[in-house]
A protein has these predicted regions:
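Short amphipathic helix-loop junctions that connect adjacent transmembrane helices
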Residues: 29-44, 143, 263-280
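C-terminal transmembrane helical hairpin of 12-TM major facilitator-type secondary transporters
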Residues: 309-354
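Primarily residues marking transmembrane-helix entry/exit sites
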Residues: 3-14, 43, 112-120, 226, ...
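Transmembrane alpha-helix termini and helix-breaking/packing motifs in multi-pass membrane transporters
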Residues: 32-39, 96-104, 167-195, 299-300, ...
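Multi-pass alpha-helical transporter architecture, strongest
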Residues: 60, 94-96, 195-208, 322-329, ...
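C-terminal ends and interior cores of transmembrane alpha-helices
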Residues: 82-112, 317-333
């Protein structure tokens, strides 16, 4: 009997998620270090690389959503996984060529720019493939295959995997990257790339097995389109859908710099607050730990209050804790700094809990034929918020002006509460199987 047949569908989906997330997190963690090995002292090179990746993903996201809706599940999974595979493989090749060119004294060569752009484009393709796979697994296969009464529990395990890989994969990747022969400084990068490539193979066969053996009916496809039509985006239609306001409430949270994992906040704590790196690192690690609490609190409140009410409580908790955090921040004393950081950590329970709720609401409410379109819209809005936030940060004349971003962040979270309450108050009751989820 094959090993795959011994695993439940939910377990196979979670295992696939673990494989792809661990590889993604490890690769993303070491790419800027590898760029700094090739271009020492040139932090702007790494920043420019990620800017290209973000903008490229932003531009291709709506089209990828339309493409998902017009193609069979097995084809979507195949393209998502193998697009990542060949993009990472290309990235390894371009890194090797860049390193060789620089070592040979070719810093002024036109080929250097060409190879860097090629490397960045491979990053765009890897990001796009990851996004396609995430939407396919989390937003299409999961709501189609997991029993409605088990969906909250399943999503909690998805979140645990995401948080575990967010913490664990960079630690392992950092250890691999640090140990290398003197003559081959990118050996760690290539090992991590190989780890990624190997992980894609079982991931693909797991997901293919899930689709083929689950008895899942053929996906309701929207009308097939030409490639030209796929790139013609009707955002007005997506924005007019009622689900947009749910998506917007979550996207507003991405306009916040009040995150343990935020690079802007970390820079401020180091430059203005003079906190040591060890304390900043501990703060970052505890952010994931507090996020794990939501994987227990959210399902508990769903059982007691319902999906919408649990989401409201968690989002409200984030607003209250950040309100206290910003008040402490405004005081400016040494003690208030730690109150500020402590409340940010507490707010992660609310943030991750609401994230679970918003994710499950999209799973339950978006019709099958529009899952690609509307879930890619969610990615589009969060990416837009990230670009807006970093653009605002780059315009700050002095580090001390970071305080304005802190106040804007609180306003964005409070606005998210207003938008979500207004949207959810119109939902009434959603029936899922034999269970009613009362949106109170």
């Amino acid at each position: 009997m094959k090993v795959q047949s011994l695993l439940r569908i939910e377990t196979q989906l979670l295992l696939g998620r673990l494989l792809t997330r661990s590889g993604d997190q490890a690769w993303d963690f070491v790419v800027p270090f590898a760029l700094l090995v090739i271009f020492p002292g040139k932090l702007q090179v790494a920043a420019f690389y990620y800017l290209i990746v973000k903008i490229g993903t932003f531009l291709l996201t709506p089209s990828s959503g339309k493409w998902i809706d017009t193609h069979p599940r097995i084809q979507v999974v195949k393209w998502g996984v193998w697009l990542q595979f060949f993009a990472i493989l290309a990235g390894m090749v371009f890194f090797g060529m860049l390193d060789g060119l620089v070592r040979a004294g070719g810093r002024e060569s036109w080929l250097l720019s060409v190879l860097f752009i090629a490397l960045a484009l491979s990053g765009v393709m890897a990001s796009l493939g990851s996004q396609i796979t995430d939407i396919s697994v989390g937003n299409d296969l999961a709501p189609s295959l997991v029993a409605p009464e088990k969906l909250t529990h399943f999503n909690s395990w998805l979140r645990r995997i995401d948080l575990a890989t967010e913490v664990g994969a960079p630690i392992l990747a950092g250890a691999l990257f640090a140990f290398h022969p003197e003559q081959l400084p990118l050996a760690g990068l290539f090992l991590i790339g190989l780890w990624n490539l190997v992980s894609f193979v079982p991931e693909y066969f797991l997901l293919r097995n899930v689709i083929q053996r689950s008895g899942l009916k053929i996906k309701v496809l929207t009308e097939a389109q030409s490639w030209k039509d796929t790139f013609h985006i009707n955002l007005r239609g997506s924005f007019s859908d009622p689900i947009f306001w749910l998506i917007l409430s979550y996207a507003l949270l991405w306009l916040s710099v009040l995150s343990p994992h935020g690079v802007l906040l970390a820079a401020y704590l180091k430059d203005e607050m003079r906190l040591p790196e060890t304390e900043i690192g501990l703060f970052r690690g505890l952010g994931a730990v507090f996020g794990l609490i939501s994987t227990v609190s959210f399902p508990y409140l769903v059982r007691r209050l319902g999906l919408i009410s649990s989401s409201r409580w968690h989002l409200g908790f984030q607003g209250v804790t950040l309100g206290i955090a910003v008040t402490a921040f405004a005081m400016g004393s040494t003690a208030s700094v730690y109150v500020f950081l402590g409340c940010i950590l507490l707010s992660r329970v609310g943030l991750y809990g609401f994230s679970n709720g918003e994710f499950e609401l999209r799973q339950r409410l978006i019709p099958e034929g529009r899952r690609g379109e509307l879930n890619s819209l969610s990615s589009l809005t969060t990416t837009s918020a990230t670009l807006i936030l970093f653009s605002a940060g780059s315009l700050l004349p002095q580090t001390e002006d970071f305080k304005y971003l802190v106040y804007v962040s609180l306003a964005a979270v409070l606005l998210a509460n207003v938008v979500f309450i207004k949207w959810s108050s119109r939902q009434g009751v959603v029936t899922s199987g034999s269970e009613n989820l009362y949106f109170q």
